Amino acid sequence: MAQDYHHGVRVVEVNEGTRSITTVSTAIVGMVCTGDDADAKMFPLNKPVLITDVLTASGKAGESGTLARSLDAIADQAKPVTVVVRVPQGETEEETTTNIIGAVTAEGKKTGMKALLSAQSQLGVKPRILGVPGHDTKAVATELLSVAQSLRGFAYLSAYGCKTVQEAITYRENFSQREGMLIWPDFTGWDTVLNAEATAYATARALGLRAKIDEQNGWHKSLSNVGVNGVTGISADVFWDLQDPATDAGLLNQNDVTTLIRKDGFRFWGSRCLSDDPLFAFENYTRTAQVLTDTMAEAHMWAVDKPLNPSLARDIIEGIRAKMRSLVSQGYLIGGDCWLDESVNDKDTLKAGKLTIDYDYTPVPPLENLMLRQRITDQYLVNFSSQVSA
């Protein structure tokens, strides 16, 4: 013990000071697919599988179902770490939906999309960009949003079965969760199995593109207005004009539906999510909140069970402030701060081993509506004669 009698020299380490905070990984895709002829060893049923090379993995994904096509769609955009859960194709769409939604067996094993919840414990990664390309019915979408909330991830959903703009807008009314974005219609592209043009799931492209944007730009940039690779068309007519709000695209965006446009290639158009809270109207607002939540929480496990001295609180606050300054300087946030509120940290609370630290932040808004004001004037004619003489 440090207080025991000793005739000599002792060294006691004092490990105080701020700790650096590392931002959690965000470019990790998680998806549920069908593919009955896939390699059963590489893609066992109802088990999360970690893939680090999606293009190579697509070669063992078979030809049926959605697995191979979805992996190829992601590979067209980027090469993100991907967690895949393969489920059996049912005899009917309803049976497939049940397989995708999954359950928990009597032995405690999670199946279907619920297996994504086991990814962190089994694989060491947490999927945050979620989708079920080609099979995201309303029932599947509803369950996927619940999984997204549990993982603090974000789900990209299709307006399943919708054929018109009005149907897509009506379909949007089924959801209120900030953890999702609704997309309509789909892309088209060349299908090497069918040897023909076919539907190319927009949600699968969204998964890959979201990971690409995270890696190249950051989670503060929305999915909108970034070129999409590997597609040749759009499955439905969507009228869009950059300067006219009275268009199909404008109406869809106004109702929180992201659409597809063709302008210098093909692009997603729309930055809004399904939130019923205006504070999280944009996709990147939700993802910013999620990233900060996990980053700040996971960065402070070291502090749990440490002696609750003023120096400990000071180290936590200074560490968070330093991280906020770093995120602001890199453009991920507009601003942020951290402080100790004395009113909630009274002696009884502190005596019970509880410490409350407050921090705030301002996310980076996407430039959704640029207004340029044009004026005609004759003032540049005032010096006409002098300019001629010169």
Task: Set out the residue ranges of the language-model regions.
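Surface-exposed assembly/interface segments
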Residues: M1-A390
